[in-house]
UniProtKB/Swiss-Prot annotation:
UniProt protein name: Probable beta-glucosidase M
Reactions catalysed, as given in the entry: Hydrolysis of terminal, non-reducing beta-D-glucosyl residues with release of beta-D-glucose
Source organism of this protein record: Aspergillus fumigatus (strain ATCC MYA-4609 / CBS 101355 / FGSC A1100 / Af293)
GO terms assigned for molecular function: beta-galactosidase activity; beta-glucosidase activity
Keywords from the named record: Carbohydrate metabolism, Cellulose degradation, Glycoprotein, Glycosidase, Hydrolase, Polysaccharide degradation, Secreted, Signal
Active site (record annotation): D290
Function noted in UniProt: Beta-glucosidases are one of a number of cellulolytic enzymes involved in the degradation of cellulosic biomass. Catalyzes the last step releasing glucose from the inhibitory cellobiose.
Keyword Glycoprotein: yes
């Protein structure tokens, strides 16, 4: 949209826009010229410099690219057809021993193939609050990609962040808090790339709803993709934050998103690509489109786009033509090719890497070579990951763990396994509220993959019953089942579904709520497990006296049932915490409950205005003093923990803005200078060992009441005490100064809060800068 627009041209565009502002409110705007200039143009596209750890890879890449013909350079920039099951392919250059690239979904496990694992989802890892677990999951999951000949893992996800409660893809990301999301994406990128598989962190940026995410036809008229309209401060403090952590970790590629940003498409937005990503953050890798997200030709390349997937109709020979006629500099094409090849070298894929797509058959149901991606060494991480993402939110009368039950009654559609386990079976053409025919272990769309097996709750419960001599009655289809009055406990299983392509129809469904209430009416010990692909409100029944325990089980992957039984019987102690806020009623989410819809005069150009600024989720609840059902960071354990001994070091006196320095990957290196250290002691005051997530929140002057700025998950034996430490760096303590275009330390008193959740903070203190 903004290609080659100089100051005079920009002034003209702004003048045009000012004229258009007088359009009648009851008539739709019909031309995108109305929006010109709303996303500032940033040109030229900066060349990769090979800074830091990228130096050797860039030296090799420049030498490689210098040997290429113009056509070979162009071929590196767009996907091509190949006889394999990869999501996308880059063609080989045999004369230079470049075998091409296979890129494949997703951040939840390898999609579209066999002999791989279905891992706990991003949301499930977010609920674990475990950085070491996030890294180990990434290492072992990426190893499966490597064995299958996949060069680029299309993940992890930190966009959507989770602004909209009903958004369909929130389950793919970690949390709607940028700090938690950023800490976990750093570990995920670093872990996956440690085994030589490139990550493609996505979806950059502000892809916060599925509704109108792509342009489409409405009554024969084209409707543009939704525009996420945001101010610079909110962009930096919320949505760019986790992408910055991904770049800091060295993410080899970034996927630009379908939506528009300030009315310029994400894959041709020079402000977000050239300005924020490649200049401010010092990104050294390449920018890849989401599938079909290219909406411009040369303008996209000039705006910072490097690779189009799965193919292109507007680049190809047009790139060389553009260079010859001066529309595009030859150096831009060289930089595109160099960034792509440098990432290949950075991952050491030029040596001892399987042939691209070697284990990705084009047709899984036709004869093909068996390539085993799974490894027995992953079993522990699969199970541990599944366990730690469960969050116990209610446990009256110590209903859990179960105590040698003689009779268990199991109810609910979510208890059983699927009738069939097929390739990517759960990509639906619409989004129902629930998956009513089977347990939910993963969401839908490109983030889903094929499990090696599904261990459903009813199967795991019956295995345990066999060992214990417990009788099990079950009815997994009735909405109002009969209940044996002598049963020790009634286990009710429901779910809440979400998928790519559609936003959720709500945060609860009447059928599931009715089932819970019907069972609770007849059973004095009703234990509810919810497999939820996002926020699920429970106000209809959470306070029922017979609902004794509730678990948010999220999306645990293939070891779902096995993990749950470990928790139900106390062999594992719940340690998960909510990575989002559960409201008492959906109205408490305000304007951020539903996705934005087209409205006159923007019926043809849907607008989503991020007017709430940084106040989403718990920040919004804190500002409005709304009592949540279960606050951000909340989660129960079978033991108890006391907090004491808060200590705050003398802060390092620092200038308001970071000292000038050469930009490294991740931005100004002084952003990571430590300013102050906070420590506290945690004592396990219960009778069993457990893990606690100690959370640090900071009240920054002139900012939200409090913001997460540290967390540590520690194992503590019964009666023992351990210390946790939180190092706070410059970025942690800064706000974005729009005028200075810098992170700025605030002068004044910073409040310090340490505790169990965003609302349970027994330790408080302060320091002054």
């Amino acid at each position: 949209m903004h290609s080659n627009v100089g100051l005079a041209g920009l002034a003209g565009l702004l003048a045009t826009a000012s004229v258009c502002l007088s359009a009648p409110a009851d008539q739709n705007i019909t031309s995108d010229t109305y929006f010109y200039g709303q996303s500032p143009p940033v040109y030229p596209s900066p060349e990769g410099t090979g800074t830091g750890s990228w130096a050797a890879a860039y030296a090799k890449a420049k030498k490689f690219v210098a040997q290429l013909t113009p056509e070979e350079k162009v071929n590196l920039t767009a996907g091509t057809d190949a006889n394999n099951g990869c999501s996308g392919n880059i063609a080989a250059i045999p004369r230079l021993n470049f075998p091409g690239l296979c890129v494949s979904d997703a951040g939840n496990g390898l999609r579209g193939t066999d002999y791989v694992s279905s891992w706990p989802s991003g949301l499930h890892v977010g609920a674990s609050w475990n950085k070491a677990l996030a890294r180990q999951r990434a290492v072992q999951m990426a190893t499966e990609f490597r064995k299958k000949g996949v060069n680029v893992l299309l993940g992890p996800v930190v966009g959507p962040l989770g602004r909209v409660a009903e958004a369909g893809r929130n389950w793919e990301g970690f949390s709607n808090d940028p700090y938690l999301s950023g800490a976990l994406v750093y570990e995920t990128v670093d872990g996956a790339q440690s085994v030589g598989v490139a990550t493609c962190t996505k979806h950059y940026i502000l892809n916060e709803q599925e509704t109108n995410r792509n342009p489409g036809m409405e009554d024969g008229v084209e409707v543009a993709a939704v525009s996420s309209n945001i101010d610079d401060k909110t962009m930096h403090e919320l949505y760019l934050w986790p992408f910055q952590d991904a770049v800091l970790a060295g993410s080899a590629s970034i996927m630009c998103s379908y939506n528009r940003v300030n009315n310029s498409y994400g894959c041709q937005n020079s402000k977000t690509l050239n300005g924020l990503l490649k200049t401010e953050l010092g990104f050294q890798g390449y920018v890849m489109t989401d599938w079909g997200a290219q909406h411009a030709g040369i303008a996209g390349a000039n705006a910072g786009l490097d690779m189009v997937m799965p193919s292109t109709e507007t680049w190809g020979a047009n790139l060389t033509t553009a260079i010859s006629n001066g529309t595009m500099d030859a150096s831009r094409l060289d930089d595109m090719a160099t960034r792509i090849i440098a990432s290949w070298y950075q991952m050491n894929q030029d040596s001892d890497f399987p042939s691209p797509g070697a284990g990705m058959p084009s047709d899984m149901y036709a004869p093909h070579q068996r390539v085993i991606g799974r490894d027995a060494s992953s079993k522990q991480t699969l199970l541990r990951g599944a366990i730690e993402g469960h969050v116990l939110v209610k446990n009256n009368h110590s209903a859990l763990p179960l105590k040698s039950p003689q009779l268990l009654s199991v109810f609910g559609y979510d208890a059983k396994g699927p009738n069939a386990l097929k390739q990517n079976f759960n990509w639906l053409s619409y989004s129902p509220a629930i998956q009513e025919n089977h347990t939910l272990w993963v969401g839908g769309g490109s983030g889903a993959n094929n499990a090696a097996y599904i261990d459903a709750p009813i199967d795991a419960i019956q295995r345990q019953a066999y060992e214990d001599g417990t009788s099990v009655l079950y009815d997994i289809s009735s909405e109002d089942p009969e209940v044996d009055p002598t049963t020790d406990a009634c286990l009710v299983f429901i779910n809440s579904y979400a998928t790519e392509g559609w936003d959720r129809p709500g945060l609860a469904d009447n059928s599931s709520d009715t089932l819970v209430k019907n069972v609770a009416r007849k059973c004095a010990n009703t234990i509810v497990t919810i497999h939820n692909a996002g926020i699920r409100v429970v106000g209809e029944w959470i306070d029922h006296e017979n609902v004794t325990a509730v678990i948010f089980a999220h999306l645990p992957g293939q070891d779902s049932g096995r993990a749950l039984v470990e928790l139900l019987y106390g062999r594992a102690n719940p340690s998960g915490k909510l990575p989002y806020t559960v409201a008492k009623k959906v109205e408490d989410y305000g304007s951020l409950l539903h996705p934005s819809l087209p409205e006159t005069p923007y019926g043809l150009f849907p607008q989503s205005d991020f007017d709430e600024g940084v106040y989403i989720d718990y920040r919004a609840f804190d500002r409005a003093n709304i009592t949540a059902q279960f606050e951000f960071g909340f989660g129960l354990s079978y033991t108890s923990f006391d907090y004491s001994g808060l200590q705050i070091s003398n802060p390092k006196q620092s200038p308001q803005y970071p000292p000038s320095a050469a930009i490294q990957q991740g931005g100004n290196p002084h952003l990571w200078d430590n300013i102050v250290t906070v420590s506290a002691e945690i004592k396990n005051t219960g009778r069993v060992a457990g893990a606690e997530v100690a959370q640090l929140y900071i009240g920054i002057p002139n900012g939200p009441v409090r913001q997460l700025r540290g967390f540590e998950k520690v194992d503590v034996s019964a009666g023992e005490t351990t210390q946790v430490q939180f190092a706070l760096n410059r970025r942690d303590l800064s706000t974005w100064d729009v005028e200075a275009q810098q992170w700025s330390l605030q002068r004044g008193t910073y409040r310090v809060y340490v505790g169990r959740s965003s609302r349970d903070l027994p330790l408080t203190g302060s320091f002054t800068l």
